[in-house]
Amino acid sequence: MKRFEDRISIHAPASRVFGYVSDFTRHGEWAGNGLEVTRSGAGPVAAGMTFSTTAKQFGTQREQSTIAELTPDTTFAWDSTGALGRVHHWFALSGEGDSTTLSKGAETVDPTFLAKITSWKLSKDIPNGIHRDLANIKAHLEGPAA
């Protein structure tokens, strides 16, 4: 299926941006649809760690997410498995001083029948969601409470 990606410039160092987006339990602060995240295990966050997520979109959506890549200040990626199949998500960061370019992307790599028959809708919803998420992250990191 298609690969979607967008980027935004944030006035914050890469280490701060990375710390925020790589904290999976805080994704509900910027993601839409009432996302709730529960960590499945203990110990330091690392590739292979799993999380359970619940969101409200067309009913309750439950997914299992596994961290696929964690490279400090550079990349945070995870795979989510749920009603749409397996979707690979990522953040890529490029920082220079107090400014960071943050990219966010998603690609359905193992779609279910549901994902295939709704691909026309997903091809609109996913890019809109990525754009909204990036704007919310920027607002949080640059806002007065930052």
Where are these regions (language model features)?
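Glycine-rich portal/gate segments that line the openings of hydrophobic small-molecule binding cavities
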Residues: 38-84, 96-101, 132-146
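Structural motif
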Residues: 7, 14, 34, 50, ...
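Well-ordered beta-strand positions in beta-sheet-rich domains
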Residues: 5-7, 62-64, 88-90
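Beta-strand/loop substructures that line and gate deep hydrophobic ligand-binding cavities in soluble
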Residues: 79-132, 137-139
